[in-house]
């Protein structure tokens, strides 16, 4: 079977950018079992409740749901097991420093295949308060209204 080229999106955490202020992103590899890869190739995964932690110098992805492979047998995986993320040692050390000093969190933004390998886009993020979310919505609405007005002015319907 030929390897896929390019990037194929499997799952995206759409609430992440609403609930968190993303400060930095990292592309990480992920350690998976065979049935997990097959399940992902079917496009099944959920990142909604997912987060990452650093334990003993290793980064672990927790609470991400990859359903059991339907054609799998007794070798099937546990859907919500912890999965190891692959980062360079220097990146892990920088992450540990930022998490400890600032109280930041690691949140998965998307899960995808890149040149046949499963990757996770991991974000270093700070939680938003309710008033921050309202401000962001107000900014989006104002920007949308400006774009509408510009479009009407261009078309001469002003």
UniProtKB/Swiss-Prot annotation:
Family matches, as Pfam families: SmpB
GO molecular function: RNA binding
GO cellular component: cytosol
Domain of life: Bacteria
Entries under InterPro entries matching the protein: SmpB, SsrA-bd_prot, SsrA-bd_prot_CS
Subcellular location: Cytoplasm
Keywords noted in UniProt: Cytoplasm, RNA-binding
GO biological process: trans-translation
Xref: PROSITE patterns: SSRP (PS01317)
Protein family membership: Belongs to the SmpB family.
Annotated function: Required for rescue of stalled ribosomes mediated by trans-translation. Binds to transfer-messenger RNA (tmRNA), required for stable association of tmRNA with ribosomes. tmRNA and SmpB together mimic tRNA shape, replacing the anticodon stem-loop with SmpB. tmRNA is encoded by the ssrA gene; the 2 termini fold to resemble tRNA(Ala) and it encodes a 'tag peptide', a short internal open reading frame. During trans-translation Ala-aminoacylated tmRNA acts like a tRNA, entering the A-site of stalled ribosomes, displacing the stalled mRNA.
Protein name, entry field: SsrA-binding protein
Naturally occurring in which organism (per UniProt): Saccharopolyspora erythraea (strain ATCC 11635 / DSM 40517 / JCM 4748 / NBRC 13426 / NCIMB 8594 / NRRL 2338)
């Amino acid at each position: 079977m030929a390897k896929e080229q390019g990037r194929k999106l499997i799952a995206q955490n759409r609430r992440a950018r609403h609930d968190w202020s993303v400060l930095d992103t990292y592309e990480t590899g992920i350690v998976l079992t065979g049935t997990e890869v097959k399940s992902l190739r079917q496009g099944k995964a959920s990142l909604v409740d997912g987060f990452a932690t650093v334990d003993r110098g290793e980064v672990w992805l927790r609470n991400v749901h990859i359903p059991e492979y339907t054609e799998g047998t007794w070798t099937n995986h546990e859907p919500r097991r912890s999965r190891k993320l692959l980062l360079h040692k220097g990146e892990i050390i920088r992450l540990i420093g930022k998490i400890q000093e600032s109280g930041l969190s690691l949140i998965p933004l998307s899960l995808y295949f890149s040149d046949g390998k499963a990757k996770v886009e991991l974000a270093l993020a700070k939680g938003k308060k309710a008033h921050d979310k309202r401000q962001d919505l107000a900014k989006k609405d104002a920007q949308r209204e400006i774009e509408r007005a510009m479009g009407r002015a261009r078309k001469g319907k002003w």
